[in-house]
From Swiss-Prot:
GO function terms (MF aspect): 1-deoxy-D-xylulose-5-phosphate synthase activity; magnesium ion binding; thiamine pyrophosphate binding
Keywords, sorted A to Z: Isoprene biosynthesis, Magnesium, Metal-binding, Thiamine biosynthesis, Thiamine pyrophosphate, Transferase
PANTHER family: 1-D-DEOXYXYLULOSE 5-PHOSPHATE SYNTHASE-RELATED, 1-DEOXY-D-XYLULOSE-5-PHOSPHATE SYNTHASE, CHLOROPLASTIC
InterPro entries: Dxylulose-5-P_synthase, THDP-binding, Transketo_C/PFOR_II, Transketolase-like_Pyr-bd, Transketolase_BS, Transketolase_C, Transketolase_CS
Pathway entry: Metabolic intermediate biosynthesis; 1-deoxy-D-xylulose 5-phosphate biosynthesis; 1-deoxy-D-xylulose 5-phosphate from D-glyceraldehyde 3-phosphate and pyruvate: step 1/1
Keyword Transferase: yes
Enzyme Commission no: 2.2.1.7
Protein's name according to its UniProt entry: 1-deoxy-D-xylulose-5-phosphate synthase
Residues that, per the record, bind Mg(2+): D144, N174
GO biological process, one term: thiamine biosynthetic process
């Protein structure tokens, strides 16, 4: 069958193993063709091609439910659920999303982007099924990395206490860190244990013992213990863990052997309770460069298929904020042995991979465990260490309670570096870092800041480490401004002090973080229109520099705030509240992300859709304040933005 003719996963039913293997080959070819051109997640999807086909061979996706954890491995799923023709629009504005979205396809049964949610969601579907008296199958597919997440373990614990609820978890183990060898012994034990005769004998013996008059219908504790011990003898050590939690364990099996997986899934569907099928796959399967470097090819920008090398970018770019942070932290760690970098399975994305190589003894990776990472850092701070937790803005929101309960309330000196703060682009609404300003504003004791460029980032990192309390620093995705950097000798900033970058008497612009350079360009455009603006680099969200902002706002009389974050409870709201509390009642226009989601597109396209480019902001400001006439208190509606 030609992949282009596959518009419904049920078309896989009845295909021979050879035909399924040919479909797998076509999926890999299309996957590589598109990702090498447009960029995206590469290794995860290549590793689950056979798993996807084998699983869907045993399901009716018009009725059954499959929840893919995270969703970055679901490109094969998309290719066989009616999106083959549009797959070349992957992660592009208006095109196929890089993750699963319920609004994109009826076969995307649950949306995601963050790890470890699949088991809870699929179990919830199974609970709803049981309550309605229906009979569709519910499956969660989760990777071994995501299984380290607390919510996944909580869901397994819950499912194990529902012995009569049919429910399947497929563990996609592509690391082999928790797997024993896949071999004949495992195959034999698995086949024997789950064969019909063994199941019959086991059930029959138990029923016969319970029927004895003197047993009272109960299995003696000694016999129950013996039965459990005998069961564990036939299960690999990792499987015994799941068996103890109430699951029937099958595996490990070869995740690229379609025939064997089909047989195993068919058997699993017949079990009347929770089942975990342990499948061992190779991340990047079928593309040698991705198999050899599974971390580097997890996700890729556009690359040359023949060499595996990224296509050269247009012009030389300044180093990214992440790289500047990582290199600066290395030097600070070398100067102070109490400084420790912490990541939650995102070392490469945050720049901490540099620290891992340079000063490994001052580096910790806790896995996908954001809540644990925050409280671990709090405990370290109690004992005199200076933990620096580098984490994506969107992932830190998973640990909001820990920020308040374990760090904020106790006023502990923990530094949080929120990478990918603001608009991130093609990963879409699950990954936009638009909420950290709002949620950090609400936590007492925190000092919160954002740099205007990479040099100010260096000074802010030093400021955080010298501060005797919790501090948070937000940095954007992508390259810096190209300003000169110091190799050492960074001076800390005065807490809560902003700076004036240019002066004018017609308008006051107060900008935060990545919006400061854009504010300066906007001020130049306004000056060309005859409007002279004062621009403040706020630097700090908490505490806000009221001594600088209030007198200028009172004198100039018109204020604009700029932020790359949610307007609801954001930086602009902080400025407005501060002015209002001190009876500085001046017209204020807030520019930022309105109350909506930001869909997948390039960062530039997202900013254009949100009205956040300098040209657009200049025009919006002039419209709002009616050029040079008396400012209006009534703002114009923000431009229509990308939303889901």
């Amino acid at each position: 069958m030609r992949l282009s003719e596959l518009t419904h996963p049920n078309q896989l039913h009845g295909l021979s193993i050879a035909e399924l293997e040919d479909v797998a080959r076509q999926i890999r070819e299309r996957h590589l063709e598109v990702v090498s051109t447009s960029g995206g997640h590469l290794g995860p999807g290549l590793g689950v091609v056979e798993l996807t086909l084998a699983l869907y061979q045993t399901l009716d996706l018009d009725h059954d439910r499959v929840v893919w954890d995270v969703g970055h491995q679901a490109y094969p799923h998309k290719l066989i659920t009616g999106r083959y023709g549009d797959f070349n629009t992957l992660r592009q504005q208006g095109g196929v999303a890089g993750y699963l979205k319920r609004c994109e396809s009826s076969f995307d049964h649950f949306g995601a982007g963050h790890a470890s949610t699949s088991i809870s969601a699929a179990l919830g579907m199974a609970v709803a099924r049981e309550r309605r008296g229906e009979s569709f199958k519910c499956v969660a597919v989760i990777g071994d990395g995501a299984l380290t997440g607390g919510i996944a373990l909580e869901a397994i614990n819950h499912a194990g206490h529902m012995p009569n609820t049919p429910f399947l978890v497929v563990l996609n183990d592509n690391d082999m860190s928790i797997s024993p060898p896949v071999g004949a012994l495992s195959t034999h034990l698995n086949r024997m244990r789950h064969s019909a005769p063994v199941q019959f004998i086991s059930d029959s013996v138990e029923e016969r013992v319970k029927s004895l008059p003197f047993m009272g219908g109960e299995l003696p504790a000694e016999l129950d213990l013996l039965k459990g011990s005998m069961r564990r003898l036939s299960v690999p050590k990792v499987g015994a863990v799941f068996e103890e939690l109430g699951f029937t364990y099958m595996g490990p099996i070869d995740g690229h052997d379609i025939e064997r997986m089909v047989r195993t899934f068919e058997t699993a569907h017949k079990v009347g309770g929770p089942v975990l099928v342990h499948v061992v796959t190779t991340k990047g399967k079928g593309y040698p460069y991705a198999e050899a470097d599974q971390v580097g090819y997890h996700a890729q920008s556009a690359f040359d298929l023949s060499t595996g090398k990224a296509l050269p970018s247009k012009g030389k770019k300044p180093p990214s904020y992440s790289k500047v942070f990582g290199e600066t932290l290395i030097k600070l760690c070398q100067q102070d042995s109490t400084v420790v970098g912490i990541t939650a399975a995102m070392a490469t994305g945050t720049g901490l991979d540099l620290l891992q190589k340079a000063v490994p003894e001052q580096y910790i990776d806790v896995g996908i465990a954001e809540q644990h990472a925050v409280t671990l850092a709090a405990g370290m701070a109690c004992e005199g260490l200076k933990p620096v937790l580098a984490i994506y803005s969107t992932f830190l929101q998973r640990a909001f309670d820990q920020l308040i309960h374990d760090v904020g309330i106790q006023n502990l000196p923990v530094t949080f570096v929120m990478d990918r703060a603001g608009i991130v682009g093609a990963d879409g609404p699950t990954h936009q870092g638009q909420y950290d300003i709002s949620y950090f504003r609400a936590i007492p004791n925190f000092t919160v800041m954002a740099p205007k460029d990479e040099a100010e980032l260096q000074r802010m990192l030093v400021t955080c480490l010298q501060h005797q309390g919790p501090a948070a620093l937000r940095i954007p995705r992508g390259s810096g401004e190209g300003v000169p950097l110091l190799d050492e000798g960074w001076k800390p900033l005065a807490i809560g002090r902003g700076e004036v970058l240019c002066e004018g008497d017609d308008l006051l612009i107060v900008a935060y973080g990545v919006m400061v350079p854009a504010a300066m360009i906007t001020a130049q455009l306004l000056q060309e229109a005859g409007i002279k603006a004062t621009v403040i680099n706020a630097r700090f969200l908490r505490p806000l520099d009221q001594a600088l902002i209030h007198p200028l706002a009172r004198r100039i009389g018109s204020v604009v705030t700029m932020e790359e974050g949610a307007l609801a409870g954001g930086f602009g709201a902080a400025v407005v509240e501060s002015l209002s509390d001190q009876d500085v009642l001046v017209p204020t226009f807030r520019i930022g992300i309105p109350d909506q989601l930001v869909d997948h597109a390039s960062p530039q396209q997202s900013r254009e859709a949100l009205g956040l480019t300098p040209t657009q902001m200049s025009e919006r400001i002039q419209e709002h304040f009616c050029l040079n006439s008396k400012p209006s208190l009534v703002g114009q509606e923000a431009p229509q933005a990308l939303s889901t």
